[in-house]
């Protein structure tokens, strides 16, 4: 028989030595947790709605599976904190600069507009315009009298009038400017009302007793309806010098005798 080189005690001793060596090697190695790297942000993750308490990061993180050894273990789910996830994404090489700027703008606090001092149109309710001066009837009466006397005041006259009315020179100057503009508008309105509206008169043509000298186009001129000729109302007395008069009797008789008895020299040439 072949002698067995291995006994039970030897096998047990070797197994104990291997177990001790395994413990030493495990104690010398650092513990590395099985935590896979998170995926880079996608368009869906970038545009998903965010909440204030950070629940969206925990709800939408992807579950990962970690296998230890050949036999395999149960699935382990990893949910990183929002701060760690933000640091990991910020250090990723695949994350572009444009995306980081967008995230920074989204995460940065925006100035809150105070709507108490603004109305619904966005305009400030606090009136920044200069308040109008309310003149008393006595002041207006004196200003009107000064304006009727002189429409343009000098520096000394304006100062004197402002002192008498207990007003500032700027107020007096502004009132005179507005009063001149008002007077100018009144004059323009009066001139516009005095100008009569244009009247369209019918087109007239000269009168020709025998008709128009040249034939005219029917569409070029206005043709009144045909009416019988009416003599002018005023009586026309012709000049006697241009009316032919009958010859006297003796002139007619002398002319007849000459025609009946021609002179003798006429017979010579016949």
Swiss-Prot record:
SUPFAM superfamilies: Homeodomain-like (SSF46689). One of its GO terms (cellular component) is nucleus. The keyword Nucleus applies. It is found in: Nucleus. Induction: By vent2B downstream of bmp4. Probable transcription regulator. Acts in a ventral signaling pathway downstream of bmp4 and vent2B. GO terms for molecular function: DNA-binding transcription factor activity, RNA polymerase II-specific; RNA polymerase II cis-regulatory region sequence-specific DNA binding; sequence-specific DNA binding. Keywords: Developmental protein, DNA-binding, Homeobox, Nucleus, Transcription, Transcription regulation. Residues 89-99 have a biased composition (Polar residues). GO terms for biological process: BMP signaling pathway; cell differentiation; determination of ventral identity; mesoderm formation; negative regulation of DNA-templated transcription; negative regulation of transcription by RNA polymerase II; regulation of transcription by RNA polymerase II. Residues 17-66, 88-134 are annotated as: Disordered. This is Homeobox protein vent1B. Expressed in the ventral marginal zone of gastrulae. At the end of gastrulation, predominantly localized to the ventral region of the closing slit blastopore. At early tail bud stage, expression is maintained only in the forming proctodeum. Coiled coil: none annotated. Residues 17-26, 44-59, 116-131 have a biased composition (Basic and acidic residues). The keyword Transcription regulation applies. It comes from Xenopus laevis (African clawed frog). SMART domains: HOX. Residues 128-187 bind DNA.
